[in-house]
Amino acid sequence: MRQRVMIAMALQCNPSLLIADEPTTALDVTIQAQILDLMMELKDKRKEAAILLITHDLAVVAETCDRVIVMYGGEIQEIATIDELFKNPLHPYTKALMDSIPKMDTKEKRLKALKGMVPSLLNMGDGCKLCSRFDPKDCACGGTGEEPELYEVKPNHFVRCNPSIFD
């Protein structure tokens, strides 16, 4: 109820940008659908309005977003259209996120997870932020330990990876 009231109050101001930080967390699916419908109503009625949705829920992303920015450790790791990201995730972290989604068509009981724990943003240091979570050969830096640059791999699809990992 509180989320709906807050969104309704925000929409009364006719914003050109609605920032929604985890708007559906800890909600049952019925209320979650109502919240998402409310936000999509804003998007449909006001063509010049935009919604910045901050979430870890890839199902919500798939249902509501046009473009996606995947972040880790406060850094952009991948940017793509929703279709491109779900069809062709390129960054190892994005692939790991996709692999952590339960699949209905397999008998696999155990979900895949990254090794280790998420490090504190205060203790990440310089260099590649993902080295502690991936084996060197699978890491975005290609095992160099250096923070890769964000580059465009195809029109409107950007990834922060050492190009050598695609060889």
PLM regions with names:
Residues M6, A50-L52, R133:
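ABC nucleotide-binding domain signature
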Residues L18-D21:
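Catalytic Walker B motif of ABC-type/P-loop ATPase nucleotide-binding domains
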